[in-house]
């Protein structure tokens, strides 16, 4: 385990932006767990299937509509343009949420717990609440590494 702790090249390129202390603290726990725990693997695969469904079935299908509208915007009326914009908004959400969900599931199979990254942002009642629910780990990163060091308060 000390070899794993010394290697600082553990990078997750999709999903939540996790704090290193959260991941490192879980490395010690992995040695206490069975290498393959059926319930953990099953839960991880369910997360991954949900993520693949969001990406392949929803996001990619909605992208066809959004792309068509944006590629030929000049030949459509207001209603279709609004529909294209709504489709694009859901495509973006489903793309981001699917990558995060797949990453959470694959990490869970390996014994790691990652934070949820989206909390139904399109049901927010304000822009502030939307941003709090959208890409949560990115917002926390901006808060902890930019906003607070530049003089912001922790209560904001």
Predicted regions and their residues:
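Membrane-embedded transmembrane alpha-helical bundles that form the catalytic cores
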Residues: 1-156
